[in-house]
Amino acid sequence: ADRFNAKRTVSACFLLHAVALCLMSVDASVSRIPALCGVFLQAASMAFVFPPLFKVFAQCFSADEQPILLSLTMPLAGLISAGGIPFFIGYCGEYYTFGLAFLTIAAMSVASAVSVAYLKNRE
């Protein structure tokens, strides 16, 4: 994140996450290799995103705003990742396909990657 722009690094991690989810959406009857690669890339992309994400927080929000931001976003992220997303994947798996769930979440990751560009640095 220091050599590259932190926002670019966060966007690249989100795009890598989207690619991983697209690989995970490949039907296992076709091949299991894309899904296995997707699982590895998905875990790696989320591990890589946190250091530059906190740097972006520091660049875009003042020291007074950062505790409020983190105290609001971290519980919300936990609710979404531990409740909303698994529910959505299960719902799609039950009524549609798991691939649809992974592709939808990949689209959300692409939207997140694009939205990072609109964060303004504090002055």
Task: Identify the meaning behind each predicted range.
Residues 2-14:
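Cytoplasmic membrane-interface "Motif A"-like loop-to-helix N-cap segments
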Residues 9, 69, 92, 100-105:
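Alpha-helical transmembrane segments of multi-pass secondary-active solute transporters
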Residues 23-27, 42, 116:
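MFS-fold secondary transporters
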Residues 48-61:
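Intracellular juxtamembrane helix-capping segments at the cytosolic ends
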Residues 54, 98, 105-123:
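Multi-pass alpha-helical transporter architecture, strongest
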Residues 60-96:
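A late C-terminal transmembrane helix in Major Facilitator Superfamily
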